[in-house]
């Protein structure tokens, strides 16, 4: 998993560890087990442990919304992107679009750096940079995701919920509920 040393540039290690968790979850691991494993393997400062936890759980919780952003910002739909790239972009987009205290430059630069040093992703570092900078421009312009026409799909995308759940919710509460 993580090949970074503890002397890696500031902020890179927590983001790498969160990315490792996302990849493990995509491969079938339970999020809490994957997170506990990466945190146990490193002696991190409490602030770094908190950042790893927030990035991993946040990106997992917001996966559908982050995929919708990738579909909007990228040339290739999220589902067709290489998984490692997709999860790295989720870490970057989560910081840019859903966290308030992370400097934009830190979110973009660390994601690009992680792509550069990752086997198989180095050539895609410009893609990471381009997608994240497009997200910044979109955010600064006040643009939001276009929502689908039907209410269950709107709720699912806006709140990163499964379709079956929002369909049941609308059936239970009605379209006006």
Label the predicted regions.
Residues 1-177:
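Class I Rossmann-like S-adenosyl-L-methionine
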């Amino acid at each position: 998993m993580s090949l970074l040393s503890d002397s890696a540039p500031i902020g890179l290690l927590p983001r790498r560890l969160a990315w490792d968790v996302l990849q493990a979850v995509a491969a079938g691991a339970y999020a809490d087990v994957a997170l506990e494993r990466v945190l146990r393997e490193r002696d991190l400062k409490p602030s770094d442990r908190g950042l790893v936890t927030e990035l991993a759980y946040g990106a997992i919780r917001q996966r559908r919304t982050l995929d919708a952003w990738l579909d909007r910002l990228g040339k290739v739909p999220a589902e067709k992107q290489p998984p490692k790239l997709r999860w790295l972009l989720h870490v970057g987009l989560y910081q840019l679009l859903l966290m308030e205290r992370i400097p934009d430059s830190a979110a973009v630069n660390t994601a690009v750096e992680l792509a550069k040093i990752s086997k198989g992703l180095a050539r895609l570092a410009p893609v990471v940079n381009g997608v994240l900078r497009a997200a910044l421009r979109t955010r600064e312009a006040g643009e939001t995701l276009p929502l689908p026409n039907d209410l269950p799909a709107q709720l699912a995308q806006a709140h990163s919920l499964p379709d079956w759940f929002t369909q049941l919710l609308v059936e239970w509460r009605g379209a006006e509920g």
